[in-house]
Amino acid sequence: MIHQLENDEVILAVDTKACEIASFQRKDKEIEYMWNGDPAYWSNRNPILFPHVSSPADKILNFKGEDHKVNNHGVCRKAEFRFLEKGSDYLLFEFEDNEETYAQYPYHFRMEVRYTLVANQVRIEYRIFNEREERLVFGFGLHPAFNCPLNPKRSFSDYRIEFEEEDVEGKVLPLNYELFDRYPTYVIHDPKSRMFKLTDGENAVIMETEEGFHIFALWTPKAPFICLEPWVNTLDDEPGIREFESAKGNIILHKGGEFRIAYRFSII
């Protein structure tokens, strides 16, 4: 089910399926900034990567001494979230473990996702709670896909990623599909930048990551969109890993613990 929020500048629509943004538009432009989930290319739009980013080639991970078949990027990509409430400037959603998630990931958890609008920007905050006796172990990442080109009269190669700091030469990475022949996923560990701008010089998406993200990645399946992905950690850093709890960068919550992380993006 779609829930909508708007202010004087933008309109945001969020789907309870996967808690993904279905649409994000400015009121003064006829531009859709978010990818539409066309399954001919990629059926997701901006999934939550939890409790792991990526997965082993055989999709088997060991949790607490037992092997479990897992989905790529975890249990939230196809999950149905529960809508909790709408305020004047926010939407709040919730997801809890269930029988299906427990078969892949044998831990109990609760997650809240809050979308807040400020002018032409949406801030998205994620809170993960451990309300049980057993400790909770997980990784985390985000995978938002933005239309590229934003202007249908332009092409993918008219766009670039501008970095706040010198994470790439000259702080600018020109986009072209050949880049993703060389790097199927373009990954930067420990980026100095907290701000990343997708732009053709006219229209833009400006992403700002808050504290806690340690990796920034770019991905496209040579499609009319680009994913700007902030991650806490990834299993790709440890090829062949089986023991999930030993993965680098995992977060551990004990009873009563809470993990909180957020990012935001503006549309121009």
Segments (PLM) and residue ranges:
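Short, Gly/Pro- and small/polar-rich lid/capping loops
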Residues: M1-D8
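Short, well-ordered beta-strand segments enriched in hydrophobic/aromatic residues
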Residues: E9-V14, V113-Y115, V122-N130
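Acidic-aromatic substrate-binding/catalytic surfaces of carbohydrate-active enzymes
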Residues: I11-D67, C227
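Short Pro-Gly-centered flexible turn/kink motifs
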Residues: V14, L61-G65, K69, I251-I267
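Extended, loop-rich substrate-binding clefts of extracytoplasmic carbohydrate-active enzymes
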Residues: E66-V118
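Acidic/His-leaning functional-site neighborhoods
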Residues: H68, H73, K78-L84, E178-G249
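Beta-strand-rich interaction surfaces with strong enrichment in secreted/lumenal proteins
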Residues: E112-R114, K248-L253
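Active-site/ligand-binding surface loops and adjacent short beta/alpha elements
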Residues: R135-V137, A145-G212
